[in-house]
Amino acid sequence: MASGILVNVKEEVTCPICLELLTQPLSLDCGHSFCQACLTANHKKSTLDKGERSCPVCRVSYQPKNIRPNRHVANIVEKLREVKLSPEGQKVDHCARHGEKLLLFCKEDGKVICWLCERSQEHRGHHTFLTEEVAQKYQVKLQAALEMLRQKQQEAEELEADIREEKASWKTQIQYDKTSVLADFEQLRDILDWEESNELQNLEKEEEDILKSLTKSETEMVQQTQSVRELISDVEHRLQGSVMELLQGVDGIIKRMQNVTLKKPETFPKNQRRVFRAPNLKGMLEVFRELTDVRRYWVDVTVAPNDISYAVISEDMRQVSCPEPQITYGAQGTTYQTYVNFNYCTGILGSQSITSGKHYWEVNVSKKSAWILGVCAGFQPDAMYNIEQNENYQPQYGYWVIGLEEGVKCSAFQDGSFHNPSAPFIVPLSVIICPDRVGVFLDYEACTVSFFNITNHGFLIYKFSHCSFSQPVFPYLNPRKCRVPMTLCSPSS
């Protein structure tokens, strides 16, 4: 009820020109009221004779001087703006401004309006349609847009999941790298600790040897001094005694005095001492980085038994050793121990056939006085002559190997010279520390085979370049005549 009254009041204070609530209302002689702006705009269209103008509603003439502000209507409009319509009047199907039902849709503004809004200045000239006419069309558009948004939502969720997964992956990778860095630097610290301990042991040994020698020299000098002191005392006693005491055995005393020879003690000039040199940390780091890099390609290598090799293989296929010597009985009950007559027949191949990629493995050769290891392109029966002279261990026969003899002689086997191609070119290798563990790195595409001394922090022992890999190659181990086994290390060792 109250809302209906308010609606009627709004109609009374609505400008007939703009159909909005009156703004600065002005009243004419006929009683109609208009917005000041609307009436001013209308003056240009309704001018009559003698300066008179006509009312836009009833066409009754009026004099501009008779126009007066309608304060009463202005107050009503002000109060009306402050009044809120009842909940019934605020329903979404009624215009908040005019209280009329919202039955029209303005295409230009994209709004639902009432019939009074359609006639207002704001929507004049716009294309309007009944809401029922456009509802289905916009429902289809909204449904299509909704499907598109749902697809976008799904894509966004997938992207969110991807970025979350990438974030977790990066976190895992960084954590792994942190662990690797900690492990690497821990290993470097172990290397430095080993170098420090080794150098201190050398200094302690040097101190012990020098002090022992000097102590011996000191003892000899004390004895020598005491002998001279006793001889001086004897001579002084003779000089202070009687003539008989002076002459008794005087020739012997004089001879003893003349034969006195002072033996100079053994000394150790400081300029001849071994000079301590700190390890080359830069070179050590470079070697360490290279070893760390190739160890990323560590493969688990085991050996493959065959009918050619006489090598003894462990059950886990990791250890290879020389067979038991054969007992030969000679004349009169004498016995002789003989080994297999050629080193070739104690060689064994790894079970992995390599035709591409990068591969790394390590072999434990500690306590062995002889061994050969590296890469082999397969056994070559036609190269089994003069095996004792290592003539088959050449790249031309498919061998890229290094070896140890007599516990100290480390060598690499290269192809023979042009004049004597059958005889291998033995390359003596200078190793500061004899390796107890050797790393082998094969880069098939780069045609290289590298050997690392793991015992000496991974320093490079030797590298074969420009290798001709025309067929599959295999890891190769040969324990020679040393019965101590050589062991293929697992990647986790």
Swiss-Prot record:
Any single Gene Ontology cellular-component annotation: P-body
EC identifiers of the protein: 2.3.2.27
Pathway: Protein modification; protein ubiquitination
PANTHER family recorded: E3 UBIQUITIN-PROTEIN LIGASE TRIM
This protein's domain notes: The B box-type zinc finger domain and the coiled-coil domain contribute to the higher and low order multimerization respectively which is essential for restriction activity. The coiled coil domain is important for higher order multimerization by promoting the initial dimerization.
Region (Required for interaction with GABARAP and for autophagy): 185-198
N-acetylalanine: residues carrying this PTM: A2
Matches recorded under InterPro entries: B30.2/SPRY, B30.2/SPRY_sf, Butyrophylin_SPRY, ConA-like_dom_sf, SPRY_dom, TRIM/RBCC, Znf-RING_euk, Znf_B-box
Binding site for Zn(2+): C95, H98, C117, H123
Coiled-coil ranges from the UniProt annotation: 131-223
Pfam families, sorted: SPRY, zf-B_box, zf-RING_UBOX
UniProt function note: Capsid-specific restriction factor that prevents infection from non-host-adapted retroviruses. Blocks viral replication early in the life cycle, after viral entry but before reverse transcription. In addition to acting as a capsid-specific restriction factor, also acts as a pattern recognition receptor that activates innate immune signaling in response to the retroviral capsid lattice.
Family, as annotated: Belongs to the TRIM/RBCC family.
GO molecular function, one term: ubiquitin-protein transferase activity
Annotated keywords: Acetylation, Antiviral defense, Autophagy, Coiled coil, Cytoplasm, Immunity, Innate immunity, Metal-binding, Nucleus, Phosphoprotein, Transferase, Ubl conjugation, Ubl conjugation pathway, Zinc, Zinc-finger
Residues with Phosphoserine modification: S86
Main location as per UniProt: cytoplasm
Protein's name according to its UniProt entry: Tripartite motif-containing protein 5
Zinc finger (RING-type): 15-59
The organism's taxonomic lineage, starting at the top: Eukaryota, Metazoa, Chordata, Craniata, Vertebrata
Record's comment on post-translational modification: Degraded in a proteasome-independent fashion in the absence of viral infection but in a proteasome-dependent fashion following exposure to restriction sensitive virus. Autoubiquitinated in a RING finger- and UBE2D2-dependent manner. Monoubiquitinated by TRIM21. Deubiquitinated by Yersinia YopJ. Ubiquitination may not lead to proteasomal degradation.
Recorded catalytic activity of this chain's protein: S-ubiquitinyl-[E2 ubiquitin-conjugating enzyme]-L-cysteine + [acceptor protein]-L-lysine = [E2 ubiquitin-conjugating enzyme]-L-cysteine + N(6)-ubiquitinyl-[acceptor protein]-L-lysine
Subcellular localization, as worded in the UniProt entry: Cytoplasm; Nucleus
Organism for this UniProt entry: Pongo abelii (Sumatran orangutan)
